[in-house]
Each structure stands twice: as C-alpha cells, then as structure tokens.
C-alpha cells in the first residue's frame, strides 16, 4: 500500500471519525477530550507550517490545516463545554469533507480516472 493510500485511510477513518464524533457529541464530550483537541490543534498547526515550508508546491493543503482545521480544534479545545454549537457543526462538516475528499482519491488510486490522475 502506498504512502498516499495510508494518508487517505488515516483521514477517512481516524480524522473523519473523530471530527464526526466530536461534531455530533458536542458539549457531551468526555472532559478529557477538550485538552486533547487543543493539543491536537497545536500539533497540526506546527506540523503543517513545517510542511508548507519544505513542500511549497502543495502549500494549499497545508494552508487549509493552518487556517481552518487547527484554529477550529484549538477553539473547541480551549472553550470546552462553553463552545457554541456552530463550531461543532463546522467540525462535523470538516469530518464529512475529509471522508469525501480522501475517499474520492483513495477510490481513484484503485480505479484511476482523468480527475485523479491530474492530482
């Protein structure tokens, strides 16, 4: 299995699953999840800043993580149970987007099409 396929599976199963779980559960999350989301947001922020510097040709992927995903995770993690519902719904949408985007390219790596080959 290629590295790209593993990254896609990671985002489909773990990232998509986590985001959907947090988005649906909202304020009923176990209390330990909020600091976990905060730390995860910081790690994602730092990792994708590093990646945008060493691989600038794919910087747009890193910018999505830097400017959308990590601030959302940090905000939810910091505010905890006081987080407004709209931020959980944004995370829920990000979970579905991750599953859809990475699922599309995972299937495309198995059954190539013109769209997935131009990646």
Model-derived regions, located:
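Polytopic alpha-helical membrane-helix bundles and their juxtamembrane interface segments
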Residues: 1-119
